[in-house]
Amino acid sequence: YPIEHGIVSNWDDMEKIWHHTFYNELRVAPEEHPVLLTEAPLNPK
C-alpha cells in the first residue's frame, strides 16, 4: 500500500491510484480539476 500510518510512503503507487481515480472512477481530466494536497504539521520528515 502506498500509505503507511497516514503518510504517503510510495509516491509512484500513489500517483497510479490518483490516475485511476480521476480517469476511471470520476471520469474527469485532472488538469481541469486541481487538488490541494496537505500534510499535518507534526508529520515526521
UniProtKB/Swiss-Prot annotation:
Which InterPro entries does the entry mention? Answer: Actin, ATPase_NBD
Q: What is its main location?
A: cytoplasm
Its GO CC terms?
cytoplasm; cytoskeleton
- Its top-level enzyme class, in one word, is hydrolase
Q: Which UniProt keywords apply?
A: ATP-binding, Cytoplasm, Cytoskeleton, Hydrolase, Nucleotide-binding
Q: Catalyzes what?
A: ATP + H2O = ADP + phosphate + H(+)
Q: What are the EC numbers?
A: 3.6.4.-
Source organism, top-level taxon: Eukaryota
Q: Which family does it belong to?
A: Belongs to the actin family.
What protein does this entry describe?
Actin-1
| Species this protein is from | Pseudotsuga menziesii (Douglas-fir)
